[in-house]
């Protein structure tokens, strides 16, 4: 019985970016996020309760090798949060990213309509910063719409989930 539980709790069956290799429409993240994109999202705690909502304005500039992405989040409690990403394309399927509140480098993987972004973010909580690991997926729906789902963990335990809809101008 213990072996069964350990096997079923492992991450071997987790969704992988390569699972979307031959699917359409293809999400080329530097193309989709270039220009203006509007977003709306909800943050849920580990129990699934919606704790915050936001709208966001994104503006990206692609120079042929690197995407500079400016994000401005307007939270429903009045907080305004900004972030600037520098996302570098390594090859057709691999990316690296940095931002002021990201620990080290983010790793990105692009296949078909899916883009997976893995990173550790410094999140302000009660006057201090916590390191939260993000497993961030974006799925392109058509030329204008993409859906984002991010799972946030601390010490391997889920602490929150984020659901976002993007609409490109």
Language-model regions: role of each:
Residues 21-25, 55-56, 101-105, 133-135:
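Short structured motifs
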Residues 40, 44-125:
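Central antiparallel beta-sheet cores of small beta-barrel/beta-sandwich binding domains
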Residues 124-128, 136-139:
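Exposed beta-sheet edge/beta-hairpin loop segments within beta-rich domains
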Residues 1-49, 61, 169:
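Amphipathic/hydrophobic helical signal segments and adjacent flexible N-terminal regions
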Residues 50-56, 129-134, 158-162:
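Amphipathic hydrophobic-ligand
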Residues 135-136, 140-169:
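Glycine-rich, aromatic-bearing surface loops/beta-hairpins
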